[in-house]
Amino acid sequence: MRLHRLLLVFLLMVLLPVPGLLKNIGNSVSCLRNKGVCMPGKCAPKMKQIGTCGMPQVKCCKRK
């Protein structure tokens, strides 16, 4: 029985994502939370892309 508990804990540790490591920006709300701006096409000069805003053509950009 102890082995089952140990295996369950190990699987939970492996399968659950670490909150700090995965900062996936895929919609406009998460873009705004990360102090970004949604822009169609490419990001403006002096800005870097940090994700997308729902569609691949709309980029989430943030000042460098």
From Swiss-Prot:
Protein name: Beta-defensin 1
GO BP, sorted A to Z: calcium-mediated signaling; cell chemotaxis; defense response to bacterium; defense response to Gram-negative bacterium; defense response to Gram-positive bacterium; positive regulation of flagellated sperm motility involved in capacitation
Transmembrane segments annotated in the record for this chain: none
Lineage of origin: Eukaryota, Metazoa, Chordata, Craniata, Vertebrata
Pfam families linked: Defensin_beta (PF00711)
Propeptide: 21-23
PANTHER family the record matches: BETA-DEFENSIN, DEFENSIN BETA 4A
S-S bridge residues: 31-60, 38-53, 43-61
InterPro entries registered for this protein in UniProt: Beta/alpha-defensin_C, Defensin_beta-like
Function, as annotated: Has bactericidal activity. May act as a ligand for C-C chemokine receptor CCR6. Positively regulates the sperm motility and bactericidal activity in a CCR6-dependent manner. Binds to CCR6 and triggers Ca2+ mobilization in the sperm which is important for its motility.
Subunit structure: Monomer. Homodimer.
Recorded name of the encoding gene: DEFB1
Similarity section: Belongs to the beta-defensin family.
UniProt keyword annotations, A-Z: Antibiotic, Antimicrobial, Defensin, Disulfide bond, Membrane, Secreted, Signal
Predominant location category: secreted
Species for this entry: Sus scrofa
GO cellular component: extracellular space; membrane; microvesicle; sperm midpiece
Subcellular location(s) per record: Secreted; Membrane
Region forming the signal peptide: 1-20
GO MF annotations in UniProt: CCR6 chemokine receptor binding; chemoattractant activity; identical protein binding
Domain of life, source organism: Eukaryota
